[in-house]
Amino acid sequence: MKMVLSQRQREELNQAIADYLGSNGYADSLETFRKEADLSTESEKKYGGLLEKKWTSVIRLQKKVMDLEAKLTEAEKEVIEGAPTKNKRTPGEWIPRPPEKYSLTGHRASITRVIFHPIFGLMVSASEDATIKIWDFETGEYERSLKGHTDSVQDVAFDAQGKLLASCSADLSIKLWDFQQSYECVKTMHGHDHNVSSVAFVPAGDYVLSASRDRTIKMWEVATGYCVKTYTGHREWVRMVRVHIEGSIFATCSNDHTIRVWLTNSKDCKVELRDHEHTVECIAWAPEAAASAINEAAGADNKKGHHQGPFLASGSRDKTIRIWDVSVGLCLLTLNGHDNWVRGLAFHPGGKYLVSASDDKTIRVWDLRNKRCMKTLYAHQHFCTSIDFHKAHPYVISGSVDQSVKVWECR
């Protein structure tokens, strides 16, 4: 369909083109264009930069149109499938939906971890570029970078109050950062013999746990920076450590295909979980709110009795997600659907859903009660490496090998 410009619009466009040619040094083209368009040699100031402004406006409008089209497609799909619409969903049913609210760039290498601050409207990303970046997830604004590591930053974790940030790196160190005022590194701990792959605070905040490729887990005293315990038992690289909210136990997963649950106050392994067929990349403790959905799903699979938990989810390179009752060492559910390694897990605060990130470039939302994938988001251009679900606000964040961090609104 041919677009017809009015005489005034045609004159403005010609003046804007002339300004663009002149300001970019295309003198010969400008002279020819002025003759053919019958323009004076003087250009008015109001046309300065007009062509660029129009062009960027078109791009912005195009993105808004694409976002609206994605939301419309989403709404139409829900109507067809009979899913509850936004107005009928309770906050406990809100899940991440496309398109992303923000796509944040600035890192120069793969994103290894993304986490929310427990109190403020901030999030943190760690990267193989050896930096940690802080962002405002509500506005999408970049705040600052934390620099000090000399190799890939593998994991980050906040204490319960969000006053301290712990980070660990392939440079064999664990660092503690003041997250209240200075944003400076206040302690550096050394003791591992290989890549430090994961960190986690115990709930009281007085100790930090670290997991390493040297096959050990270490406990560090925050006040002194001293290593006070070393836990051994895994036969290969320990990929992740996560502490239960009560603090008395923590879980680790490994390249040896197992998950171990440890007693925090001793060096004893409480239980070893052994059903995965490949490296276990990630783990996540289920909130208490998830117990009823997990029990209902387990009941459908004839897993006898009412399970008390605690419950733990694990994601593996075997492309499966498993949910365990760690008190009895039993796998209650297996979730199949990803086409590649499962790299990140996060429970919905309401307990009904689990979200996962995978090397198949997707984020999937799992309905625990029905043991099915209810939503697939084609989230990134490359492997999805990490995911987090905010405990109080309707947001999910994801990180990727494509060097971007994305913020997803739940509705």
From Swiss-Prot:
InterPro entries: Dynein_regulator_LIS1, G-protein_beta_WD-40_rep, LIS1_N, LisH, PAC1-like_LisH-like_dom, WD40/YVTN_repeat-like_dom_sf, WD40_repeat_CS, WD40_repeat_dom_sf. WD repeats lie at residues 106-147, 148-187, 191-230, 233-272, 275-334, 337-376, 379-411. It is found in: Cytoplasm, Cytoskeleton; Cytoplasm, Cytoskeleton, Microtubule organizing center, Centrosome. SUPFAM superfamilies: Lissencephaly-1 protein (Lis-1, PAF-AH alpha) N-terminal domain, WD40 repeat-like. GO terms for molecular function: dynein complex binding. Residues 9-41 form the LisH domain. Belongs to the WD repeat LIS1/nudF family. This is Lissencephaly-1 homolog. Residues 56-83 form a coiled coil. PANTHER family: WD REPEAT-CONTAINING PROTEIN POP1. Dimerization mediated by the LisH domain may be required to activate dynein. HAMAP family: lis1. Positively regulates the activity of the minus-end directed microtubule motor protein dynein. May enhance dynein-mediated microtubule sliding by targeting dynein to the microtubule plus end. Required for several dynein- and microtubule-dependent processes. It comes from Drosophila mojavensis (Fruit fly). One of its GO terms (cellular component) is dynactin complex. One of its GO terms (biological process) is positive regulation of axonogenesis. Keywords: Cell cycle, Cell division, Coiled coil, Cytoplasm, Cytoskeleton, Microtubule, Mitosis, Repeat, Transport, WD repeat.
